[in-house]
């Protein structure tokens, strides 16, 4: 992909670069951790790939979490698109991991067993146990969520679909259908929810989808909302395959 094509819009999906808790193999969810130096470098490279592909985002959508916001800022700077409008919304947040937030993934798997671990981590409609409001990793009284009538205490992927896809259809999709190039910088599970919608992936098969950090995934979408390149195109397919495999292997190493 070298040039933008006005016959269709482009939707660029970018998972945040490696975070501190990606590196330490902890469930993160809505906990607001920072990027590692590797994560910042991934964000730079992601932005460079966007520029090298001839893509020129006209607007950015991201979450309220630092790791996605920072990734977006770095990537846009590298792409020379640092000046475009930015929309931040909680509905692009990572899935809330409930009482698992802060726990090591490998230790959690050892404690509860492979089947329960994978059900919490990858099933479509099985949420982890809810987090207590007084837990240090809960979002109780977090000012960024002051306008929410209720802050989630846990979520499954279905919950993310229910909050994010209506927002996508109302706010983001019309721009893409109109021929714009839109960058969405978000999280593993909010992007899995969107890819499920775009590619019409079944509730069962979505368990096998993993999104690598820092590698842009581009969908071409026409004026009717039809995806012209099912599955999208990673701007670095080899690195994306390796990154997705690394995500799938989480839970192995402590």
From Swiss-Prot:
Protein role: Catalyzes the interconversion of 2-phosphoglycerate and 3-phosphoglycerate.
UniProt xrefs under Pfam families: His_Phos_1
Binding locations of substrate: 15-22, 28-29, 67, 94-97, 105, 121-122, 188-189
Disulphide-bridged cysteine pairs: none
EC number, UniProt record: 5.4.2.11
Any one GO MF annotation of this record: phosphoglycerate mutase activity
Known pathway: Carbohydrate degradation; glycolysis; pyruvate from D-glyceraldehyde 3-phosphate: step 3/5
Source organism of the structure: Corynebacterium jeikeium (strain K411)
Catalytic activity: (2R)-2-phosphoglycerate = (2R)-3-phosphoglycerate
Protein name (Swiss-Prot/TrEMBL): 2,3-bisphosphoglycerate-dependent phosphoglycerate mutase
Keywords, in A-Z order: Gluconeogenesis, Glycolysis, Isomerase
Residues annotated as site: Transition state stabilizer: 187
Biological processes, Gene Ontology terms: gluconeogenesis; glycolytic process
Active site: 16, 94
Family affiliation: Belongs to the phosphoglycerate mutase family. BPG-dependent PGAM subfamily.
Coiled coil: none
